[in-house]
């Protein structure tokens, strides 16, 4: 059962993949992620390799600021009791020669509502190093940067904040990998993150509703269960070691120190064995029924399964909430059990693993389920015995004998039927036709993955223990519902079989269950294989397959997963269809996106109040990101262009809205300083405030240039279509003007532009006139636009009203999705095309210089893939039969650096043109999903401010340090 150590890899919600490196001589931890090459193909980013060794906490700090990382400082250590002590870390030269060891397990904080940015790394000796992504001692960084928070060397915890630097192969290091075959009794067997108190949204199923002739999904908000840390805690986690030692780590929100509490598991009947056990398996499970954590162990010495419950008292002081007390922990031994030696047929069984599942979704019986895995000796089979761990149920007749006075007919007799003792209630057996190499659970323990030794993987649903890939087989309708889908595999999608499993180091099902991640022992990088259906020729299955993929994507979005695994699975499936029939592939994409809008509960034709919420929501970005990725498949770029336009417009709206709010704040600050009785701002401080205010305006100049150019581009397309209505290359404008989402976004931007213009006109910068040039230039850009924005706004509002009236007269559920996805008007609704062309000519073009519009330079919008990606990679780089993820060795030699994929001309977030200095200072970031390159979040160079000053300004919010406008992850180039 130990053939695959699947705990040596962890795929974060953010998209980062951390895995152990057992071959390298200069590192033992790798960080990689999937990055887009050209919008269609992607690859694993070359791994950053780190060396995690027991003396890492002794390395001197490079910075003494100590801020930004969970408040932890680099100069204190906390002993293994509750109270912290302070000491100075040892010198790096203390050990002339040091060793590092193999990593035994890696754990991102992905559980429940946690964000997936903290990483617990455990080596085979039992040392645990806590890391965080996206933070440094000096503040926020990109997510691909790691910083150590503290290190636990089994007996002592060392608080030491230090940013980790990737190792290079040729560095002269005194660190040496030490291989050992010994099994240490301090090795961490399992690690569990405690959830925060935030609830999550869980998708339960989707089904076809015959009453409305479309698929509907059911989701519910789920509160955390078991033990979760209160808001005054930053995090909490616990681990179980081979010797039965339980370590509990935590940090208060107002504290710099990380603390640890240590307990020992032991059987009360044999206390002398305390700390001397040698566990083979251990599992920590957050259970739902009594606010506890279940700890399950199997001992080699005793041959017994033991079950314990951990209770945590957070010691909240209700009288003085500001007083924070350390938590108290209590362990209770609840049951011992033995494993079977033979089955019912007398065949010899070899016990191989124990796996425990929580019942996350509240049910009448929320007791955890225990799986005991056995190999059937002499056969290729395995069997899984299922048990329910709960309180002993006492029969009524038995109770009547023991206690005759008990009234068993009483309505409240149910309370007397359960004893305080626990037992394992047998539920059934799963007979598996292949030997099991490993077991894992997915999606909050709702699904169980069995990894077979022949390279196959199967997933069962915990609710009914049916094979997910066969869910729709022989499934009959239930009332008005049919085709009930519970996961992304329900429609018959399967995982590919992994070849040569004996050389595979680990395999894991991806976070959204849309594929498998695995690594061969002597390969540097892992491989990813999306789920698939071998035969895609049956067109009748397109509708249910599209609904299944949409349901899977919504499920991953609700769980805050990055979702690149499911995007790749969708792309691969559509590419297979496109190879047969491209029109059918476009229809499939439209159906998938239509279901996506439906499952997210927003209608593209919603009224204004709801539409305002939709355009500012995170789900809209997730939807447009998928449309962008799927649209990159087709030679007709309208699908991906529309997605990129909506993402860009959303960003422009965000920029103007943010600047307007910050301008108001700066003006109030300066006015209050002048008029109040408090001491006025000093000259330097006053200039700094004035400079920051006007620099906000300056940041809008490239954004405004892009917006003016984009509106001009749309009217250019109107001019072309007016003269040539059948022109196939200039139809994006029909989708932008015809669909309500982009129309609403443009109207919102025009409103924000008027707001900003009114502020800078009413409050010009008079104290430092040179700073007011940014306001003057911004107004000039708007005035000199070839499009009259007032007339244009009136036009869009009229279009809104007329199309809303048209929708009431001729309702159509597919009109808006078709406009949004294909940027085209359905043939049966050609009146919309005629109306848009005629009305825009009468209201917009008639009040402008048509020749000036037609000959305006609208290059550099970067809404098409041709403008975005380098020509050398802007194509399908290998046949789809060879996979959608490219091995770096198969790429053109000149296109192996991430810098070579995207055209480095314009900033993808600020819309500013890169200068030569910016391109050469090695401070560029790229999005792993859409491919945008940006410097947003970094200090602005002095040659790009109004006047050169010593004031450091970043302009764009901290959120753009880590995340792109499409919600992809930014990484440094």
UniProtKB/Swiss-Prot annotation:
An example Gene Ontology molecular-function term: RNA polymerase II-specific DNA-binding transcription factor binding
Keyword annotations: Activator, Nucleus, Transcription, Transcription regulation
Residue ranges of coiled coil: none
Organism: Candida glabrata (strain ATCC 2001 / BCRC 20586 / JCM 3761 / NBRC 0622 / NRRL Y-65 / CBS 138) (Yeast)
Subunit composition and interactions: Component of the Mediator complex.
Family: Belongs to the Mediator complex subunit 16 family.
Pfam families per record: Med16_C, Med16_N
Protein purpose: Component of the Mediator complex, a coactivator involved in the regulated transcription of nearly all RNA polymerase II-dependent genes. Mediator functions as a bridge to convey information from gene-specific regulatory proteins to the basal RNA polymerase II transcription machinery. Mediator is recruited to promoters by direct interactions with regulatory proteins and serves as a scaffold for the assembly of a functional preinitiation complex with RNA polymerase II and the general transcription factors.
GO biological process: cellular response to heat; cellular response to stress; negative regulation of transcription by RNA polymerase II; positive regulation of transcription elongation by RNA polymerase II; positive regulation of transcription initiation by RNA polymerase II; regulation of establishment of protein localization to chromosome; regulation of lipid metabolic process; RNA polymerase II preinitiation complex assembly
Protein name: Mediator of RNA polymerase II transcription subunit 16
GO cellular component: core mediator complex; mediator complex
Location (main, coarse): nucleus
Entries under InterPro entries matching the protein: Mediator_Med16 (IPR048338), Mediator_Med16_C (IPR048339), Mediator_Med16_N (IPR021665)
Subcellular location: Nucleus
């Amino acid at each position: 059962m130990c053939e695959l150590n699947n705990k040596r890899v962890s795929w974060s919600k953010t998209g980062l993949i951390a895995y152990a490196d057992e071959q390298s001589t200069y590192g033992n931890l790798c960080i990689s992620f999937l990055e887009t090459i050209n919008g269609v193909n992607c690859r694993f980013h070359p791994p950053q390799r780190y060396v995690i060794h027991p003396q890492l906490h002794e390395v001197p700090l490079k910075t003494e600021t100590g801020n930004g990382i969970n408040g932890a400082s680099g100069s204190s250590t906390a002993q293994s009791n509750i109270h912290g002590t302070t000491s100075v870390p040892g010198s790096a030269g203390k050990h002339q020669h040091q060793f590092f060891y193999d990593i035994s397990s890696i754990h991102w904080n992905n559980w429940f509502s946690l964000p997936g940015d903290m990483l617990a790394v455990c080596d085979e000796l039992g040392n645990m190093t806590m890391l965080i992504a996206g933070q440094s001692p000096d503040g926020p960084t990109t997510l691909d940067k790691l910083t150590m928070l503290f290190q636990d060397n089994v007996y002592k915890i060392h608080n030491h904040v230090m940013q980790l630097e990737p190792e290079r192969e040729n560095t002269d290091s005194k660190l040496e990998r030490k291989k050992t075959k010994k099994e240490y009794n301090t090795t961490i067997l399992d690690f569990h993150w405690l959830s925060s108190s935030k609830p999550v949204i869980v998708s339960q199923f989707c089904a076809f509703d015959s009453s409305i002739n479309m698929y509907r999904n059911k989701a519910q908000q789920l509160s955390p269960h078991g033990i979760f840390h209160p808001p005054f805690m930053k995090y909490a986690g616990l681990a179980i070691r081979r010797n039965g030692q339980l370590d509990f780590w935590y940090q208060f929100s107002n504290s710099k120190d990380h603390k640890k509490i240590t307990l020992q598991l032991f059987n009360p009947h044999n206390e002398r064995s305390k700390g001397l056990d040698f566990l083979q398996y251990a599992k920590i499970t957050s259970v739902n029924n009594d606010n506890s954590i279940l700890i399950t162990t199997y001992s080699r010495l005793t041959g017994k399964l033991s079950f314990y419950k951990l209770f945590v008292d957070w010691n909240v002081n209700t009288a003085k909430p500001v007083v924070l007390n350390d938590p108290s922990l209590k362990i209770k031994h609840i049951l011992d059990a033995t494993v079977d030696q033979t089955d019912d047929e007398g065949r010899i069984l070899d016990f191989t693993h124990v796996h425990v599942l929580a019942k996350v979704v509240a049910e009448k019986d929320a007791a955890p389920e225990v799986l005991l895995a056995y190999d059937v000796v002499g056969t290729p089979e395995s069997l899984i015995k299922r048990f329910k761990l709960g309180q002993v149920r006492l029969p009524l007749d038995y109770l009547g004998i023991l206690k005759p006075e008990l009234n068993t007919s009483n309505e409240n007799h149910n309370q007397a039927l359960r004893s305080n003792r626990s037992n394992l209630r047998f539920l059934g057996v799963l007979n598996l036709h292949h030997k099991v190499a490993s077991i894992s659970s997915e999606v909050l323990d709702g699904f169980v993955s069995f990894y077979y030794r022949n390279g196959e993987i199967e997933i069962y649903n915990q609710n009914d223990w049916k094979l997910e890939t066969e869910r729709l087989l022989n499934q009959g309708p239930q009332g008005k519902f049919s085709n009930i889908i519970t996961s992304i595999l329900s429609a018959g999608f399967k995982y590919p079989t992994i070849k040569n499993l004996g050389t595979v180091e680990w395999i894991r099902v991806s976070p959204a269950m849309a594929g498998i991640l695995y690594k061969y022992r002597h390969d540097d990088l892992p491989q990813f294989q999306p789920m698939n259906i071998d035969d895609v020729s049956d067109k009748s299955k397109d509708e249910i397959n599209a609904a299944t993929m949409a349901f899977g994507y919504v499920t991953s979005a609700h769980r805050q997963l990055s979702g690149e695994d499911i995007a790749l699975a969708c792309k691969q499936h559509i590419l297979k269809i496109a190879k047969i029939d491209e029109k059918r592939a476009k229809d499939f994409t439209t159906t998938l996106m239509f279901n996506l809008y439906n499952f997210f509960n927003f209608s593209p034709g919603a009224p204004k109040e709801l539409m305002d919420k939709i355009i500012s929501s995170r789900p809209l970005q997730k939807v447009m990101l998928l449309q962008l990725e799927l649209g990159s498949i087709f030679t007709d770029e309208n699908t991906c262009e529309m997605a990129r336009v909506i993402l860009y417009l959303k960003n422009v709206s965000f920029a103007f809205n943010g600047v307007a709010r910050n301008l108001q704040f700066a003006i109030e600050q300066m006015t209050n300083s002048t008029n109040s009785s408090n001491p006025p701002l000093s000259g330097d401080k006053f200039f700094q405030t004035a400079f920051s205010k006007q620099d906000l305006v300056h940041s809008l100049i490239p954004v405004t240039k892009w917006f003016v150019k984009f509106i001009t581009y749309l009217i250019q397309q109107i001019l072309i279509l007016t003269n040539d209505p059948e022109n196939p290359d200039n139809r994006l404008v029909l989708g932008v003007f015809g669909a309500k989402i982009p129309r609403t976004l443009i109207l919102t931007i025009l409103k924000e532009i008027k707001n900003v213009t009114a502020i800078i006109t009413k409050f010009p910068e008079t104290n430092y006139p040179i700073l007011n040039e940014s306001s003057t230039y911004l107004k000039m850009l708007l005035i000199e636009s070839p499009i009259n924005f007032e007339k244009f706004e009136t036009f869009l509002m009229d279009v809104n009203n007329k199309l809303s009236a048209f929708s009431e007269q001729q309702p159509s559920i597919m009109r808006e999705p078709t406009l949004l996805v294909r940027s085209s008007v359905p043939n049966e609704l050609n009146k919309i095309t005629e109306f848009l062309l005629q009305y825009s000519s009468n209201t917009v073009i008639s009040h402008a210089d048509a020749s000036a519009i037609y000959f305006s330079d609208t290059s550099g919008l970067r809404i098409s893939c041709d403008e975005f990606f380098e020509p050398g990679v802007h194509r399908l780089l290998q046949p789809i039969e060879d996979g959608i993820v490219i091995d770096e060795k198969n790429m053109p030699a000149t296109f192996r650096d991430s810098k070579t994929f995207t055209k480095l001309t314009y900033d993808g977030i600020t819309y500013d043109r890169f200068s030569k200095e910016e391109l050469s200072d090695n401070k560029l970031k790229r999005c792993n999903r859409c491919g945008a390159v940006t410097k947003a979040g970094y200090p602005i160079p002095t040659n790009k401010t109004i006047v050169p000053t010593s004031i450091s300004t970043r302009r764009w919010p901290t959120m753009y340090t880590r995340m792109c406008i499409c919600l992809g992850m930014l990484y440094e180039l």
